[in-house]
């Protein structure tokens, strides 16, 4: 999470196993698609910050280990010049040292508006 604001996606291949299921707001993506999504953020936003409020890993009764991250994403649209801070929830299910299931949840409205400006 420290590398994302620096536009460094090198950690993604180390975090996820080859069969990982990654879900971003209801859309299943590959590790490569997630990396491209992160790179796109840096093309259309500046001053990106990812401030973690809580990072908790728990082992549940069924034996599964999950890490939950609650954070705030913030940035300024390069075209709109608007800024926003968006609450984010990330959930990672671990199989040993690799993630095999992940969910990224946030309100995409601000990001989608900036994407639309850049598609014109």
Locate each region found by the language model.
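A solvent-exposed, acidic/Ser-Thr-rich amphipathic alpha-helical stretch
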Residues: 9-59
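Low-complexity, intrinsically disordered terminal/linker segments enriched in charged
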Residues: 101-120
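Small-molecule pocket liners
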Residues: 1, 20, 90
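A short, glycine/Asx- and small/polar-enriched loop/turn
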Residues: 61-67
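Short alpha-helical linear motifs
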Residues: 36-41, 93, 109-112
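Exposed beta-sheet edge and beta->alpha loop/turn motif
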Residues: 70-106
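Short, aromatic-enriched amphipathic alpha-helices that serve as compact interaction elements
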Residues: 1-7
